[in-house]
Amino acid sequence: MNRPIRFFSFRLSLTFAALLLITASGAAAQSTAPDIKYATAFTIQSFDTYRLLTVTRPWRGADRTFEYLFVKRGTPDPEGYPGAQRIETPVSSVASLAATHLAFLGRLGTLDRLTAIANPQYVSSETVQAGIAAGTIAAVGNGPDVDLEELLSVNPDVVTTFAMGKSTKDDYQQLLSLGMKTLIFSDYMEETPLGRAEWIKVMALLFDQEAEAERIFDDIERRYLALTEISAKLEVKPSVIMGSSSGTSRHLCHQLESPFITTEIRIIQQTIRI
């Protein structure tokens, strides 16, 4: 009488194990989306061993998107993303062709991974300038004239850049043709300060620091919203004259074409005078 019972128990165990495998395989295919509150130019989907970043608005009037797979080191490549660029994380080195990206690296505590920078004259970070002076951070050109030979000699794990949809000014196609992992940031497309700040979540993907990026951004959001509440209560709202400077020359704006600037001024409830 014991044999049928043991046989039934064995069959039950097999059934239970099969259910576990089915459940596990189904869970692996599920994704979660980080809370993107303000940014509108990218989306992120998180899976067990990789994250999918889609840059939905790489430049003004763009008719294409860019997909990136951030795959945890030592794990197999996911299937089903033929056009996506694969970046193994965490990266050990990064080259930045835009000075604005350095703020994200600084807040994440990853400036020590920076090995090359373009437009060093626009860099105010003392840490980065010291690295350039010491030769640990390479200066790889200015504007659209990137020193590709120098950049190749540095051989970073990934290059962060931006694009404008103009072949004479964009460098990402050349970098890709040379086999370099190239991540396009379009934070400049965001029309609000918090939208731009939220791109720290994109930079964090390179270093597997998503949780840290969430914490940093939540703090930025809290402090920013607190300041806007203060400005909303001000009875006297100063006028603003918009302009730019180049050397000893000063230029006043005759019109405001940047949605970012107009949105920022509107948020703090100031009056535009042009």
Task: Annotate the PLM regions.
Residues 2-14:
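Bacterial N-terminal signal peptides that target proteins for export
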